[in-house]
């Protein structure tokens, strides 16, 4: 009788612990689902105060990352964490560094190194998320079997592909003399090309804005092509209805500068200034930052 009672107590305690663990897992899943929901990012992207967002993002990113470590199966959390690293590197580290005066070259180098590190950190999180969903993806990518690696991808995978490629190429753009990284750039280009195939209108034409910058900035021997840059610029403006200002800056700072076309350069910057940041609430932060760059 005592032995039977002991067994029952052990079973009861085991079930209690299991239920507690299950409840904790369910609660964490709900929190993660909420944080990773498509609309959650507008808390940041819809803000009109870049300094406020810039101060808040580091804590937010590390909070997301700590949850991600506890929940390695949650792809939405990985997408948010990886993309936030890349957004932060671009908007709050690289962008201020780009605007530093010549005499602050050492500070600029330091900030560029930080941005590169965070670009790659975000990229790696996103690539691992894709490998988790499609086992063998990273191995095929490393072997340059791009078609085989990307064939299973669907439209739902576009955000992971886009941000991984953006972080990858952002890091290379900051440090084009990193030959080891440069050797891997075709993989990033393959990811972005797959985005173009699956969802050319993604995020208001973000992929076309990317290609405006890519074809406009790259040297000829790496695929630079001003005609293609202008073609993607038109498609980016069409996709966004002219409410997102990044394409104007992308064309101005690459093609217009390289062609020494001052008239076009000034015209494009004036178009940035003419867009009301409130016209597209979901991109208010981006348009506010771009407005500062153009002033």
Residue ranges and their predicted role:
Residues 1-8:
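Bacterial N-terminal signal peptides that target proteins for export
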Residues 11-15:
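Alpha-helical transmembrane segments
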Residues 17-20:
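C-terminal motif of bacterial Sec signal peptides marking the signal peptidase cleavage site
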Residues 22-25:
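Bacterial signal peptide processing site
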Residues 33-66, 70-71, 84-197, 206-239, ...:
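Short coil/linker segments at helix-helix boundaries
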């Amino acid at each position: 009788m005592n032995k039977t009672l002991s067994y029952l107590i052990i079973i009861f305690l085991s079930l209690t612990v299991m239920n507690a663990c299950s409840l904790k897992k369910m609660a964490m899943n709900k929190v993660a689902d909420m944080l990773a929901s498509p609309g959650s990012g507008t808390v940041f992207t819809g803000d009109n105060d870049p300094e406020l967002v810039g101060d808040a993002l580091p804590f937010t990113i590390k909070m997301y990352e700590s949850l991600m470590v506890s929940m390695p199966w949650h792809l939405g959390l990985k997408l948010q964490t990886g993309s936030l690293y890349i957004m932060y590197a671009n908007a709050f580290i690289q962008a201020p560094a780009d605007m530093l005066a010549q005499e602050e070259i050492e500070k600029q180098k330091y900030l560029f190194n930080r941005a590169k590190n965070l670009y790659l950190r975000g990229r790696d999180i996103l690539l691992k998320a894709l490998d988790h969903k499609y086992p063998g993806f990273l191995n095929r990518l490393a072997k340059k079997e791009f078609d085989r690696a990307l064939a299973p991808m669907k439209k739902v995978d576009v955000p992971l592909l886009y941000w991984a490629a953006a972080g990858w190429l952002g890091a290379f753009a900051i440090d084009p003399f990193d030959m080891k990284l440069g050797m891997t750039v075709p993989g990033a280009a393959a990811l972005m090309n797959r985005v173009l195939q699956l969802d050319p209108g993604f995020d208001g034409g973000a992929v076309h804005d990317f290609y405006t910058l890519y074809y406009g900035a790259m040297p000829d021997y790496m695929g630079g092509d001003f005609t293609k840059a202008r073609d993607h610029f038109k498609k980016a403006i069409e996709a966004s209805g002219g409410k997102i200002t990044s394409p104007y800056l992308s064309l101005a700072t690459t093609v217009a500068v390289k062609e020494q076309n001052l008239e076009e350069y000034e015209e494009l910057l004036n178009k940035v200034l003419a867009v009301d940041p409130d016209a597209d609430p979901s991109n208010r932060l981006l348009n506010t930052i771009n407005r500062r760059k153009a002033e």
